């Protein structure tokens, strides 16, 4: 390789600041080194909420972001997952009590498909019917929350505790609860992906009708 080629390669190497979405105040999440912007596109980065807010008490909340746009010196991201640390969740489990969870897939008002996983911890052992009733409350309130919120607002409701508080307030009338959390929220599909899936489903349905 000529000296000129080596010099050109070195000059293209640069640091890129990794930037959080607007709802996280465009905070800098970190930095990465690359010789080609395309090598950064699609990368994921996991940080804690405490890394963003500076509050160590929020280090149990893990956030995952994915690079979806790269400029000359910055890599911008989208939110793809919120998850509570396993050690924290294990600390909430008590012998002789119930742990009730659910996985609920919903669609927000701006057509993002998201899965949320709330979990409730009772003070003592609940019976099967009580567990089912609490799970039903979880499903209903998560679906209601999605029906009223954009993707960004639903993320805020999960991370800031409004959703878990709403579940706690209603479910505790069924059986005494010690704590409710949203242990995980995952982006499953963006609006354009949802639209493409629906269009494909319509095409399949029309083909079935034509065959009949």
UniProtKB/Swiss-Prot annotation:
GO terms for molecular function: structural constituent of ribosome. Pfam families: Ribosomal_S3Ae. Belongs to the eukaryotic ribosomal protein eS1 family. Keywords: Ribonucleoprotein, Ribosomal protein. This is Small ribosomal subunit protein eS1. It comes from Haloquadratum walsbyi (strain DSM 16790 / HBSQ001). NCBIfam families: PRK04057.1. PROSITE patterns: RIBOSOMAL_S3AE. GO terms for biological process: translation. PANTHER family: 40S RIBOSOMAL PROTEIN S3A. One of its GO terms (cellular component) is ribonucleoprotein complex. InterPro entries: Ribosomal_eS1 (IPR001593), Ribosomal_eS1_arc (IPR030838), Ribosomal_eS1_CS (IPR018281).
């Amino acid at each position: 390789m000529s000296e000129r080629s080596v010099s050109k390669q070195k000059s293209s190497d640069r640091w890129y600041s990794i930037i959080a979405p607007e709802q996280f105040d465009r905070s800098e999440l970190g930095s990465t080194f690359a010789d080609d912007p395309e090598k950064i596109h699609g990368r994921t980065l996991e940080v804690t909420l405490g890394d963003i807010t500076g509050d160590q008490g929020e280090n149990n909340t893990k956030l995952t972001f994915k690079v979806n746009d790269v400029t000359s010196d910055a890599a911008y991201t989208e939110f793809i997952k919120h998850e509570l640390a396993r050690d924290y969740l294990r600390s909430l489990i008590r012998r002789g009590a119930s742990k009730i969870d659910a996985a609920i897939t919903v669609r927000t008002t701006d057509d993002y498909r998201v899965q949320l996983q709330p979990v409730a911890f009772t003070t003592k052992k609940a019976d099967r019917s009580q567990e089912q009733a609490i799970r039903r409350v979880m499903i209903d309130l998560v679906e209601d929350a999605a029906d009223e919120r954009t993707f960004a607002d639903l993320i805020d409701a999960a991370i800031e505790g409004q959703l878990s508080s709403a579940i706690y307030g209603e479910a505790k009338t069924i059986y005494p609860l010690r704590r409710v959390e949203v242990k995980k929220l995952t982006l499953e599909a963006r609006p354009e992906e949802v639209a493409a899936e629906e269009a494909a489903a319509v095409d399949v349905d029309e083909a079935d009708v034509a065959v009949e």
